[in-house]
Amino acid sequence: KVVRIWGKNVEIKMYEKLGAKPTTIVLRYSDSTIDMLTKTRYHKYINEKIKDMDLPIMVDDENEKSDIFYESAMNYLRKYANAHRDSEQRVYQDLKEYNFWRNLYGCKWIAIIMDAFIAVRELCLIDNFNVRDMFLNMYPTYVMFVFMMICIMLMCIVVNKNIVKQRAFEYAKSLAEVCERFVEV
């Protein structure tokens, strides 16, 4: 639960930096995640199928109030996808992946510090530390130390803001695609 809270803090900062939720951004004509023709088709579908919805159909129709409708439309699609998890498995999978990377990024520094403590502990337990032996005779003396160093490198290199942002937009895109499959309201 603590890690989820840290992940949600990351999410809030990301939204502030982006200026909106990725689920809102992908419906904007200024965003290229979804091509213009598909986006216009999605806007038309949403306007037809969701009561009282008025998404802009052309680029020139978009204004500062459009985000309110985009967010409302995506909230509807999210509720629909959650209620139909059996048929919307991709959306659910993308959501789980986004949540995983968001939460992992949220606890990144704690994980690195813990891995570093374990690596230092292992280093202290090794008699006559030798870099040559670490590569040539790794097992069993150096295995845990090398493993912790690899974990630290992976956390530093792979777990970053870009992967969280990428997963957020993948989820947003798959959620937007739901509008082609949902039933009339």
Residue ranges and their predicted role:
Residues 2-3, 108, 116, 150:
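Hydrophobic, lipid-facing residues on alpha-helical transmembrane segments of integral membrane proteins
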Residues 56-138:
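Membrane-proximal, non-transmembrane alpha-helical segments
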Residues 137-138, 153-185:
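Cytosolic/matrix-facing juxtamembrane and C-terminal tails of multi-pass cellular membrane proteins
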Residues 1-11:
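Transmembrane alpha-helices and immediately adjacent membrane-cytoplasm interface residues
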Residues 144-156:
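Short acidic, glycine/tyrosine-flanked loop/strand segments centered on an H-E-D-like triad
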Residues 11-90:
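Charge-rich cytosolic interhelical loops and cytosolic tails of multi-pass membrane proteins
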